[in-house]
Amino acid sequence: MSENTAERTTRRKVREGLVVSDKMNKTITVMVEDRVKHPLYGKVMTKSVRLKAHDENNEAGMGDRVRIMETRPLSATKRWRLVEIIEKAK
């Protein structure tokens, strides 16, 4: 293997969101909100998406603010993993 193929410098997406479900074993559902401007009318809208993330130690709970990172497919719907818990729920 050459040095170029040994070192991959792929940029992985990192998102912050709120944990909306932690009922599954080693999996959390994270609601990620993004503010986008409408292309024609210019109104700023909030778009949200629910992503499933891998939580190896079941650390995150409902209402926690977390940072997740894109990874290889771990299951049929899981392509993200928990990086850190930014703020625990009160």
Curated annotation (Swiss-Prot):
Annotated GO CC locations: cytosolic small ribosomal subunit
Transmembrane segments: none
Domain of life according to the entry: Bacteria
GO biological process terms, semicolon-separated: translation
InterPro entries named in the record: NA-bd_OB-fold, Ribosomal_uS17, Ribosomal_uS17_bact/chlr, Ribosomal_uS17_CS
Keywords annotated in UniProt: Ribonucleoprotein, Ribosomal protein, RNA-binding, rRNA-binding
Presence of keyword Disulfide bond: no
A Pfam family the protein falls into: Ribosomal_S17
SUPFAM superfamilies from the UniProt entry: Nucleic acid-binding proteins
Regions annotated as coiled coil: none
CDD domains given in the database record: Ribosomal_uS17
A GO molecular function held by the record: structural constituent of ribosome
Function of the molecule: One of the primary rRNA binding proteins, it binds specifically to the 5'-end of 16S ribosomal RNA.
Assigned protein family: Belongs to the universal ribosomal protein uS17 family.
Quaternary structure note: Part of the 30S ribosomal subunit.
The name this protein goes by in its record: Small ribosomal subunit protein uS17
Organism, scientific name: Cutibacterium acnes (strain DSM 16379 / KPA171202)
